[in-house]
């Protein structure tokens, strides 16, 4: 029953239930009120407008409500937009929440097994123990990591997005390690798997998928470095220099200060990770 936005055409009549991700009121240049909506189902999001809020057939609802919408597809500045004619808030039982979350096209359990295969390939005992403490021995962490997105909107902003992105970056890094023998593969792969772990605390879970207070104040790079540092302290005799190198790779993975990294890459592994991260983010968008 779901049509992706790219499959919709101008003048199509839409009669569907959506999650209202965002609802904002505004005024036209003439001073007339209207509502801007972002509607979501598992295929993605759709911009919508209610040009006559409060009119007959336009019921009251808020952001994060599930709503039944009837309207027509139009075009605005080259993008499809839904002109809403009727809307009502639906009741529980009329919808299944999981149908309204964008989900990775790839098999989530299969991706996680592939990620655990990379964990198993790590030879350095302290790095392997650190990875296993999260990805093998912590069932709650596994559930969260499989479900979470990698971003609010920029890239991999869907259920399984964090896992898909982390695995892809780690695979790029595995390739780099095979091409360039000077790279420490164990350090690079470990950093790749961990690089966006802070997204678990930076972004709230679906359906909100929005920035938390810590996300706004600290950001995922600092949060992730702290998460890894806290766990390192539970592992006996973890080499101090290795811990610093791993944390540096996480801190520097955006590559440049203006892109949000508090440090620029000072290790070849940090540089390789920043390239792998940038490639995967750009290719997904």
Model-derived segments and their meaning:
Residues 128-172, 194-198:
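A short mid-domain helix/strand-loop element embedded in enzyme catalytic domains
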